[in-house]
């Protein structure tokens, strides 16, 4: 089976990228090297092609009313021009996907539009789940990305670089805010979507635009000595920032409370949603396992599947792990028995047949300077 390719694939080849199969897409794992790319984002800026991710459009009269049942978070807690990080759940409260939902407001008379930016591996599942359970003809659902590019510009210099490219200020847009508009010097017809969001723990933007405009932006950034970055750096950046990766830290058998995402469950809102009954019970009676952060002694990396012990008892499993270029230590996420999930508790981690000490910590290993 042929791998899917981004419209920017030719730029990968031109830039000597190392390519891998990621969720059925041929994507760059690195360009100039993971550490180099990671540090560029932390100190200045870097950019990523994230076109493997999905963009679902929902259009109609008041689409929030019809799609609220898919999300445990109150969709009326954010308004036009804003985004919201949330979860889509199954009937048992398991996480189908974690995603960002954007309110684009009214696009034509009485017709409003919502964008969902979803994980690459979950696009078909998400699309089918919504389509099969909408139960209304008042909302249309479609692929908003098609042959477009999803582009991420991340780092403390990202805003001023983007402003220079669009020749317009974005200072009025808040964190998680978005716009969908035409910039005439780029294209007299194309509407470009962008949001102040990211997956790195830094200031950043995620941008949906045509291949032609994306190549223009790529070349502009390279001319400013900004590096293209691959999925390797994206993974170490997100792990340092305490952000989940679907398929490793989240899946359909984990719930928001277990994943440390209970703040996204608005039971007090009294709206009905898939999984509500199960989560009400879990909220009342507690959880058996919990996702925690781990600082690991030495330089051994605890990868997905490594077992966690306490006094010889197996208490959990690592889901994500890497070396932290910023903190210069091994870090990881692990699901462990809730009774052991206390900060500063020392545990043992089995890595390639050897035992290493680990200390339970908060999941955010890094926070940017304000």
From Swiss-Prot:
This is Aminomethyltransferase. The keyword Protein transport does not apply. It catalyses: N(6)-[(R)-S(8)-aminomethyldihydrolipoyl]-L-lysyl-[protein] + (6S)-5,6,7,8-tetrahydrofolate = N(6)-[(R)-dihydrolipoyl]-L-lysyl-[protein] + (6R)-5,10-methylene-5,6,7,8-tetrahydrofolate + NH4(+). GO terms for biological process: glycine decarboxylation via glycine cleavage system. GO terms for cellular component: cytosol; glycine cleavage complex. The glycine cleavage system is composed of four proteins: P, T, L and H. The glycine cleavage system catalyzes the degradation of glycine. Belongs to the GcvT family. Pfam families: GCV_T (PF01571), GCV_T_C (PF08669). The gene is gcvT. It is an enzyme of class 2 (transferase). One of its GO terms (molecular function) is aminomethyltransferase activity. SUPFAM superfamilies: Aminomethyltransferase beta-barrel domain, Folate-binding domain. The lineage of its organism: Bacteria, Bacillati, Cyanobacteriota, Cyanophyceae, Synechococcales. Its EC number is 2.1.2.10. Keywords: Aminotransferase, Transferase. InterPro entries: GCS_T, GCS_T_bac, GCST_C, GCV_T_N, GcvT/YgfZ/DmdA, GcvT/YgfZ_C, TrmE/GcvT_dom1.
